[in-house]
Every structure is written in C-alpha cells, then in structure tokens.
C-alpha cells in the first residue's frame, strides 16, 4: 500500500506523448487534483499490433480503440486542460512550459489555502 497524493499535480505533455504515455495522460486527466498542460498529445495506445506485408514492409496499427470518460476516441491525441503554444525555448532562460506550470500550481495552491481559511 502506498501513499495517496491529493495535492495539485501538473502533467506536461506535447506531441511526443503517445502510446503508454498517452494512456497515462488519459488516466491522470480524470483525477480532480490534476491539470494537463502543453499541446495535444501524439495519441495512440490502442494495443499496437505489428505485421509484415507481402512486399516486406512492416506496418504497426492500433488493434483497439481507447475512449475518455466522455466517450471521445483518444487515438489522435488528448487536448490538455491548459493549452500552450507549441514552442521550443532553446537558449531561453525560462522554459515556457515550466513557467506556465509553476504559475498554475501557485495560483491553484493559493486558491486551496484561501478556501481552507474560510472554513
């Protein structure tokens, strides 16, 4: 038995999140204390199968569909709760994804503390 974490969590995602990481994002998005931040994920994750065509080419495809709680197919990716510009911060002092996530967590924690004081 482990520890149950109920504090705010931010999961950073981009188009490089696919397959099992896409499934992880889906499961995390369903939790009330989690916000997904970034750009739409790369999708996939529906039990990938591989096969070889008669000409020798290899193909890989999802053998099943995966749906979110609303019934939407996630094969083409998951849209984050907080969508950021798809930008690379090469040479920048501050990574825009990390900065946005830190700001979100700070605001979120302050809201929680404010509600606790009122109780």
Please tell me what each predicted stretch does.
Residues 1-119:
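C-terminal "post-core" interaction segments
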């Amino acid at each position: 038995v482990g520890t149950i974490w109920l504090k705010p969590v931010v999961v950073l995602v981009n188009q490089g999140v696919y397959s099992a990481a896409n499934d992880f994002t889906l499961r995390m998005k369903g939790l009330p204390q989690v916000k997904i931040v970034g750009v739409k994920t790369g999708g996939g994750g529906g039990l990938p199968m591989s096969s070889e065509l008669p000409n020798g080419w290899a193909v890989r495809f999802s053998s099943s569909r995966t749906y979110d709680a609303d019934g939407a197919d996630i094969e083409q990716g998951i849209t984050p709760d907080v969508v950021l510009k798809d930008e690379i911060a090469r040479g920048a002092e501050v990574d825009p994804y990390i900065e946005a996530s830190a700001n979100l967590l700070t605001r979120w924690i302050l809201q929680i503390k404010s509600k606790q004081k009122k109780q």
